[in-house]
């Protein structure tokens, strides 16, 4: 499936989540779980805010969606401002989410090939807002960024 106006609309929800996370002093990565053309839940990276090792944007969106049946996930798309890391990719695969729309993968290349290997449709938008948001954050807070992606300073 190609990029649609709907993809841009739902990526905007993830971007708003990312901005919210940054305004809270956190890392500007956001996500939205969309089912049947409606936002089921949004989320943003809350590792700093919650002192958490696992509250990335995608996992926070899944948490905010609450318990769902497998049939709901089977009809969903995960929108995320940044290419999903291995942990978030694992959650996407666990719940068999069939489609992931990524804002950008220039500042961080996640496990996109693993998603594709498991039959997930991956769409990368290379959105300028997502790229600039991450570049600005990484320049301002390199240590926090390295912590988030499991890298040494």
Question: Where in the sequence are the language-model features?
Answer:
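A short, polar/charged loop-to-alpha-helix boundary motif
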Residues: 46-60
């Amino acid at each position: 499936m190609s990029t649609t106006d709907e993809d841009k609309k739902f990526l905007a929800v993830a971007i708003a989540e990312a901005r919210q996370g940054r305004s809270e002093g956190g890392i500007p990565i956001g996500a939205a779980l969309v089912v049947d053309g409606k936002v089921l839940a949004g989320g943003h990276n809350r590792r700093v805010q919650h002192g958490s090792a696992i509250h990335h944007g995608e996992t926070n969106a899944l948490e905010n969606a609450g318990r769902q049946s497998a049939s709901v996930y089977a009809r969903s798309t995960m929108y995320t401002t940044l290419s999903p890391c291995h942990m978030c990719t694992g959650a996407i695969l666990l719940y068999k989410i069939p489609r992931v729309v990524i804002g950008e993968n220039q500042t961080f290349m996640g496990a996109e090939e693993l998603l594709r290997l498991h039959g997930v449709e991956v769409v990368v938008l290379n959105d300028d807002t997502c790229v600039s948001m991450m570049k600005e954050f990484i320049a301002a807070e390199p240590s926090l960024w390295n912590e988030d992606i499991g890298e040494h300073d």
